[in-house]
Amino acid sequence: MDDAEVDHTKPIPAYYCCYLLRSTKQRTSLYIGSTPHPARRLAQHNGESKGGARKTAKDDKRPWEMVLLVEGFTSRVGALQFEWAWQNPRMSSQHPANRHQFDLETGDVAGTSGVQPSTEAGKAKHRGRGSRRSLKAHLEDLHLFLRSTYFSKWPLRLRFFNRDVYQLWTTWCDRVDALLPEHVRTILDGDCPKDHLSWADEPRVGSVEHIKVDYSDIYDYVEKSHFLLDDPSDLRCKICQAKIALSEELALVCPRASCYCISHLLCLSSRFLDHAEEPEQLVPIDGICPLCNKVIQWSTMMQELSLRTRGHNEFRAILRKAKRGRAKAHGSVHEASAPDGVASAVENPGSRAACVESASVGVSDSLDVDNHDDASLDENWTESLDLDPNPDELLNRPKDHKMESSRVEIIIDDSDCEEMEDLG
């Protein structure tokens, strides 16, 4: 299945992650999954709400805890691909045991990665350091996949909630010579120690229940872009200085609140790639804004662009919510509609009927993830999804793949086929 056929019909999701689950009663029992709503998914695993998975339903292992999240996925398909690779390292093409490509920086073909080449991927077992189902093994595989050819180009970040898991992670990072890509951030949360790794723009939330899974982090950004692009008669690209025709070209707005830089998507991406550390990089990760000279994240701009161009209901809901927020802060809708002219852009001229129609869609329903994302899947769901794409074949994929839309909706939903590891 072509990823584009799935991802290009909806905006980039507000949040999607892969997670590592651990039993609090049998700490050797582990479970890998993916979800757009960690708190809801954890409640399902613990039997507090309907859903969950058959392998986490045993009372002798509940309650479960999410000890680690891999965040930043820009599509559900991408999260499922990473989930599958993490569950099945011996079958993933990104694992050196299968691709026969070994990281020379480790200086150890088999010992450092913890696996040995085998012609029977998925069946061979390495007896040198114990079962591949241990927490240590999962963290080693995670480190390997984050620096693999395919996943190392993704804007991912790690969020640790448990001190012991983070300590085991740092022990492995100190041991292995290969380094993670610089853009892969580590966020220490839960009972992890506070230190310089706690990024200012990625604050601690304390627990899984407090993770934001809607678009609230970019409400102001969405409203600003709507205001700046509301009058397309005289929009000019900051890079090429040419006029921007919004009906024919895609435009990007700097996500920084005090910056009003507008540019062509192609102009800005070319500029970012020209200054990228890796010359063969195809998609930017971040770059310097040509106006404010601050580092801005490419994924954030793509999320706003996808909302503006493909998520019309979500986009209008964000604008309505922002308007009501200002009205509440200033005491009246009239007072909230005046400052800086931004509020005047909330109601799109000529689209009054569309706004009225969209008002029937609840803001929470539009901005939150669908409840179907946690629906149970049949046992053969992986057969219909290309979970292990070969990077060498990505550019040669046929463009006219046909698929059953009803099946796609099931496939890309939150996986109930995650893997549980039980050493007890």
Swiss-Prot record:
EC numbers, comma separated: 3.1.-.-
Cell location: Nucleus
Assembly notes: Forms a heterodimer with slx4.
Biological processes annotated in GO: double-strand break repair via homologous recombination
GO MF, one example: zinc ion binding
One protein family per Pfam: SLX1_C
Primary location: nucleus
Keywords associated with the record: DNA damage, DNA recombination, DNA repair, Endonuclease, Hydrolase, Metal-binding, Nuclease, Nucleus, Zinc, Zinc-finger
Cofactor(s) needed by this chain: a divalent metal cation
HAMAP family with a match to the protein in the record: Endonuc_su_Slx1
Renumbered zinc finger spans (SLX1-type): 237-292
Disordered as annotated region, ranges: 36-59, 109-132, 381-424
Provenance organism: Aspergillus niger (strain ATCC MYA-4892 / CBS 513.88 / FGSC A1513)
Function of the molecule: Catalytic subunit of the slx1-slx4 structure-specific endonuclease that resolves DNA secondary structures generated during DNA repair and recombination. Has endonuclease activity towards branched DNA substrates, introducing single-strand cuts in duplex DNA close to junctions with ss-DNA.
Biased composition (Basic and acidic residues): 394-407
UniProt gene name: slx1
Keyword Amino-acid biosynthesis: no
Protein name as it appears in the record: Structure-specific endonuclease subunit slx1
Compositional bias segments (type: Acidic residues): 381-391, 411-424
A GO CC annotation given for this chain: Slx1-Slx4 complex
GIY-YIG domain ranges (all copies): 14-99
Sequence similarity: Belongs to the SLX1 family.
Domain of life: Eukaryota
